[in-house]
Regions:
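Conserved Rossmann-fold NAD(P)-dependent oxidoreductase catalytic core, especially the SDR/UDP-sugar
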Residues: 3-44
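Catalytic helix-loop patch of NAD(P)-dependent Rossmann-fold dehydrogenases
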Residues: 29-69
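NAD(P)-dependent short-chain dehydrogenase/reductase
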Residues: 57-101
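Alpha-helical substrate-binding/gating segment
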Residues: 84-92, 98-126, 130-133
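Non-catalytic, hydrophobic alpha-helical segments
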Residues: 109, 113, 128, 139, ...
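Mid/C-terminal beta-alpha module of Rossmann-like enzyme folds, strongest
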Residues: 116-165
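Conserved C-terminal active-site "lid" loop/helix of NAD(P)H-dependent oxidoreductases
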Residues: 141, 160-187
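Amphipathic terminal alpha-helices
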Residues: 191-205
Length: 205
């Protein structure tokens, strides 16, 4: 952000959009969160994201630029998704009861960003997420069904070795996206992981 302090003195920028993450909400025990929910990040990534949101807000106010925050849920794409991980043999199922996680396909992110170029309000926050929060196990099992393969091994959450995965499974929440859909008048191309994985399976894999 320091690199932009001088840039905005002479630039013709009309607004600032920061792509943040729903990790800023932290753990809400599987409950729904919206843009007014408490931010209480548990991971280093979430803490840093929240700080950067505030830094960008300060900078945008200094130059009187409209500012919007897009809090992205877990991103997947036609190239990076549970189907490719299952096919590679690298996927595993983590056993943790009542762990909910929201997702968003990268195409929907791009479409919403494009819409926002001509349709934005000053100092707003939007959750960018699909309609169906689900456990990682639920999504993986749907992928197994599509591919017609055996279920990968199950690992208990307290046996996870990866620090990144440990941080991921600290948080459980369902991300509400009604504000995003209403303001941008946007119908998701992939409203749930089902449509997203079906498309990838039928057209990419």
């Amino acid at each position: 952000i320091k690199n932009f302090k001088n840039y905005f003195k002479t630039s013709e920028a009309k607004w600032i959009t920061y792509l943040s993450a729903t990790s800023v909400y932290g753990d809400h025990n599987g409950q729904w969160v919206d843009e007014n929910s408490e931010t209480k990040p548990t991971s280093l990534n979430g803490v840093e994201r929240l700080k950067i949101e505030k830094d960008w807000m300060t900078l945008s106010n200094k130059f009187n630029l409209p500012f919007q925050i897009f809090r992205l849920s877990g991103i997947y794409s036609n190239q990076y998704n549970i189907l490719t991980r299952l096919k590679s043999g690298k996927a595993q199922i983590i056993n943790k009861k009542n762990h909910f996680f929201s997702r968003i396909h990268v195409e929907d992110i791009a479409n919403i960003l494009s819409n926002s170029c001509n349709h934005f309000k000053k100092n707003e926050v939007y959750n960018i997420s699909d309609d169906k929060p689900a456990s990682s196990e639920e999504v993986a099992l749907y992928g197994v069904k599509l591919l017609g393969i055996n279920k990968p091994k199950t690992v208990e959450v307290n046996k996870i070795e990866s620090e990144m995965l440990k941080n991921f499974y600290k948080d459980s929440k369902r991300v509400d996206n009604k504000k995003m859909k209403k303001f941008f008048n946007y119908n998701l191309k992939y409203p749930t992981y089902v449509e997203g994985l079906d498309y990838i399976f039928n057209n990419i894999i």
